[in-house]
Amino acid sequence: MTKYISLFGATTTDTQVQVVKENQVIIGIGAGASRKRYVVYKVEHTARGYVYHMVDTETKEISQTDILRPLSQTFGIGRYYDDVNPEFMDAFEVALLVRQAE
């Protein structure tokens, strides 16, 4: 089991708990409050917890992370999932994005 503790945000993230599903849209918040949209195309469970494989919907860049936080608890730079109104993309659209990214 892996737990990440944020000293600044006073939050804990348990990677053994799956927080999003495949085809779910993720919001990336960067420097200067810039926003990117990612979509999860694969959820993998490893010995260290869940790993989310995603693709940027604009640049088609593939990335992965094991830390996703709820959008309702936004605190600085990071990747967030909408825990109130989750958004999903069509599986066919996601497959096309992944193919373009590879």
Question: Can you say where each PLM-predicted feature lies in the sequence?
Answer:
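Intrinsically disordered, low-complexity, charged/polar segments
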Residues: 8, 60-102
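Short beta-strand-centered aromatic/proline hotspots
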Residues: 36-44
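Basic/aromatic-rich interaction segments and small domains that mediate binding to polyanionic partners
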Residues: 44-64
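Short, charged beta-turn/beta-strand-edge "cap" motif at the junction between a beta-strand
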Residues: 31-35
